[in-house]
Curated annotation (Swiss-Prot):
Name of the protein described by the UniProt record: Methylmalonic aciduria type A homolog, mitochondrial
Organism name: Caenorhabditis elegans
Gene3D superfamilies in the record: 1.10.287.130, 1.20.5.170, P-loop containing nucleotide triphosphate hydrolases
Gene that encodes it: mmaa-1
Cellular localisation: Mitochondrion
PANTHER family found in the cross-reference section: METHYLMALONIC ACIDURIA TYPE A PROTEIN, MITOCHONDRIAL, METHYLMALONYL-COA MUTASE
Described purpose of this protein according to its UniProt entry: May have GTPase activity. May also bind and hydrolyze ATP. May function as chaperone. Likely to have a role in propionyl-CoA and adenosylcobalamin metabolism.
Amino acid sequence: MVVRSLLRVSRLTSASCRHASLAVSSTPKPYIPSVTGVQKSMPFDNLLEQYSRVHWDDSVTYDDPNVQKLFKSLMSGSRAALASAITLVESRHPTKRAQGNMLLKMVLDEEREKYKKFGRDSMIFRVGISGSPGVGKSSFIEALGAELTENRGKKVAVLTIDPTSAMTGGSVLGDLTRMQELSRNPKAYIRQSPTSGSLGGVTRGIHEAVILCEGAGYDIVIIETVGVGQSETSVSDMCDMMCLLLSPAHGDELQGVKRGIMEMSDLLVVTKDDGDLKAKAKMTQAEYISALKFMRPRLDVWRPKVMRSSIMDKESVSEVCSSLYEFWDTIGESGDLERRRQDQMKKWMWNHVKDEIMSVFQKHPKIAHLAPKLENEIRSGKITPGLAAETMIRTFFGV
């Protein structure tokens, strides 16, 4: 009897163990798609903390001597310090990037105090200028800069964005040769930056450069883009005003400009209003005035203007300049300026998140090890790009 009971207990225990084993084996495991030639193990999990120390530097503090020295020189209006500061915030080096972020925080704190004392008078006017190649952007900016510095007593900063070649990685950066007079003006500062393929054509540090120009005491910053496209959308997210330049020499100019570019523009200027093109410029102006009637203005307090200008006629440049500041006063009094600045800061936070995540993702040991193999699988047609992307993302998160 005792033996029979022991045998029954033994059988029950054995069955329980089998059920427990099945329960354990049925526990869901992390899903990793089956990809030929890719090792499914994750040997780099322990490197995440070390990798974060390579990518970010937390040792930079408010008392960093390099940051303090650069901050004092920048606040005194040094153009050399401004150039060094912009280079610092554009750097990808962890320590330099940390120093750049600390410098930006100090500048923003200082500008906040100035705003409490002087209000809108302490703020820099941000103007984006766009237009198709050959419209005369550089010549117009030089004429506008001369009007602002010589006749209106303003300090002008010009930030130009040149496209980076997708084939060679180089860029022309030729605006300094086209703005020779303005580059020699002591009240002007010109900085050229390649897009480096980031943010739809807007270089990574351009927004920070605007903040640094404000800290250096400049009254107006002009951001010039090359061509019309995605970069104009990004530039409009960091400017107070968008100015679109149009050329009467390009035939049917109205067909060559995207509706979205016109809708985000606050001022349209037909250039080269002189000589044989004067009649054509007047006709182009009339066409755009008519076209704008069918578009809703970006702001309720401002209806976009269409003007004509020629760098040969200083009075026409002065009229454009007056329209710029008419817009500035209008949005300042209505409260749209402060609201727009706040929205821009939020958008640029998410732009930086996207840019930073992509950089971290591509350089992470897991992905650096996995990506070349997945690329080979895509080339051989054994896996779709979508599945390869999912594999990398799930490998990165370990799920």
